[in-house]
Regions:
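A short, conserved alpha-helix in the catalytic core of glycosyltransferases
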Residues: 162-167, 171-175, 182-215
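Short, well-formed alpha-helical segments that are part of the catalytic scaffolds
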Residues: 12-26
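Short aromatic/hydrophobic "clamp" motif used to bind/position activated sugar donors
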Residues: 88
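Short, flexible, basic/aromatic active-site loop/helix in glycosyltransferases
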Residues: 120, 137-158
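Glycine-rich, basic loop-to-helix element that forms the pyrophosphate-binding segment
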Residues: 67-83
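Non-catalytic, C-terminal membrane-associated alpha-helical segments of glycosyltransferases
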Residues: 233-241, 247-301
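A conserved acidic beta->alpha catalytic loop
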Residues: 22, 39-48, 95-96
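Conserved donor NDP-sugar-binding/catalytic core segment of glycosyltransferases
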Residues: 100-134
Length: 301
């Protein structure tokens, strides 16, 4: 089997049917991939919704398993442990794959047999509409990711996002999968950066990571949920994860990250002033707040 697609879910029962159906109706058919759905200790009716969906969508290889240890990294590793595919693909529970998603993944693998890791485009699907205060820079907090218009290698330390990334299973196993000290989402707590560290380990082995915009998912974003508290959790989680990751390297790496974040904070202030001068003041505060919250996460306990 070529591909194992792993979806990890925590209390997203209202989203999972759309995610699963988008894979069920792939143009490639269902023969060359499996789907492993990992319930990460949900307290809602995720299990029942999955079972109901599967009763009416009986073809293909779909497996439901549970991981009681809270955290996306734990759940992803559990899914990967039973994967039968030569490649493991990670997709979020609130993502919807485009019709040719699997077809384009397999084509990318066939066209570049030397690759070991790559990722694709993520397009936010705002419900009901993109808020006026949203900017390109802040949109990364809701999963917006469009690295290039054509397939290419990632450069300058860039890497795919966890919600649309593919890794050769043998290499994934070689580096030990996701670092559970960077668990991702644990209830309302976020400690991010798990995908970044994983790809940096692959790069350290001498490999290049690639991007292909034809490998695309839509990420559902309910605007009513984008409260200041939610945005703080996401942004501070990025900083918190970078603290864990860099301290694991050295104190010097952590200090350099602090300097980097201070420079980004300064750049955000300049960008906010630019938005005001351009007549879009609603975008100014969020872009500055993003860097403040990320810095709090980096400096916090």
């Amino acid at each position: 089997m070529t591909l194992s697609i792993i979806i990890c879910s925590y209390n997203r029962a209202s989203y999972i049917s759309d995610a699963l159906t988008s894979l069920y109706v792939q143009s490639s058919g269902l023969d060359n991939f499996e789907v492993i759905f990992v319930d990460n200790n949900s307290t809602d009716n995720t299990k029942e919704v999955y079972a109901q969906w599967r009763q009416t969508n009986t073809n293909g290889q779909f497996t439901f398993i549970s991981e009681m240890q809270q955290g996306a990294s734990f759940a992803r590793n559990t899914g990967a442990a039973i994967a039968k595919g030569e490649w493991v693909c990670f997709m979020d529970d609130d993502a919807v794959a485009t019709t040719d998603y699997v077809k384009n993944i397999i084509k990318h693998i066939q066209d570049q047999p030397f690759i070991v890791g790559f990722g694709g485009r993520i397009i936010p699907k705002y419900i009901p509409a993109e808020p006026k205060w949203m900017s390109y820079y802040v949109s990364s907090l809701v999963g917006n990711f469009d690295y290039a218009s054509t397939a290419c290698a990632f450069e300058n330390g860039k890497y795919p996002l966890e919600s649309n990334m593919i890794v050769k299973k043998s290499v994934y196993d070689q580096i030990g999968g996701f670092n559970v000290n960077l668990p991702g989402v644990v209830g309302t707590l976020r400690i991010g950066g798990e995908g970044k560290e994983l790809f940096y380990k692959i790069i350290a082995l001498g490999h290049t990571i690639y991007y292909d915009p034809s490998i695309c998912v839509h990420h559902v974003v309910e605007v009513k949920k984008l409260t200041s508290e939610y945005m703080y959790r996401v942004a501070s989680g990025i900083g918190r994860g970078e603290k864990t990751r860099t301290l694991n390297i050295s104190n010097g790496a952590y200090l350099m990250k602090i300097l980097e974040y201070l420079l980004k904070f300064g750049a955000a202030i300049v960008l906010g002033i630019k938005y005001i001068l351009q007549g879009t003041p609603a975008k100014a505060r969020p872009v500055i707040q993003f860097r403040v919250d990320a810095l709090k996460g980096l400096l916090g306990k």
